Amino acid sequence: MNRISIYRIKVLAFLFAVSTYVYPASSLELNEEARTVKLNSEGQSLTLNEEQIKKGKRLFNSHCGSCHVGGITKTNPNVGLDLESLNGANPPRNNINALVEYMKDPKTYDGSESIAEIHPSIKSADIFPKMRDLSDDDLKVIAGHILVQPKINSEKWGGGKIYY
């Protein structure tokens, strides 16, 4: 290697080290608008704090991520966790309370029957042990994570095989 190549490598290594120190990926700070989501169907909203955002992401990844990575639904690619799909459900699942209710007792997309025996939920915690240790607050922050993601990842969240 000549001197110029070694110099370039050193400069690139330095820039990389500085960029990871100055702009760490884990320190994404969301503004209040991005952290504000619908609380209920009456139009009330809730602003999640940074700790709730982090906890929601962690719980989503550990309890829901194996089937819903990136907001998709592996068992039914036609219905994801994107806002369009959540709005289209009956009743709509586009707010914290509706998603918490769904995680407690999931219903089909048209709302006609319970699917608790085939979808992890609090109601079916005996079949799906991952759900046993989740409190109402845990469900709330998971729902918050689901609703914040479209604001962060826009079309990628729930975008399916195109992105993941």
From Swiss-Prot:
GO terms for biological process: photosynthesis, light reaction; respiratory electron transport chain. Binds 1 heme c group covalently per subunit. Pfam families: Cytochrom_C550. Heme c binds at C64, C67, H68, H119. HAMAP family: PSII_Cyt550. The lineage of its organism: Eukaryota, Rhodophyta, Bangiophyceae, Cyanidiales, Cyanidiaceae. It comes from the Eukaryota. Gene3D superfamilies: Cytochrome c-like domain. Keywords: Chloroplast, Electron transport, Heme, Iron, Membrane, Metal-binding, Photosynthesis, Photosystem II, Plastid, Signal, Thylakoid, Transport. Its main location: plastid. Belongs to the cytochrome c family. PsbV subfamily. One of the extrinsic, lumenal subunits of photosystem II (PSII). PSII is a light-driven water plastoquinone oxidoreductase, using light energy to abstract electrons from H(2)O, generating a proton gradient subsequently used for ATP formation. The extrinsic proteins stabilize the structure of photosystem II oxygen-evolving complex (OEC), the ion environment of oxygen evolution and protect the OEC against heat-induced inactivation. It is found in: Plastid, Chloroplast thylakoid membrane. GO terms for molecular function: electron transfer activity; heme binding; iron ion binding. Residues 1-27 form the signal peptide. It is a peripheral membrane protein. This is Photosystem II extrinsic protein V. One of its GO terms (cellular component) is chloroplast thylakoid membrane. Its cofactor is heme c.
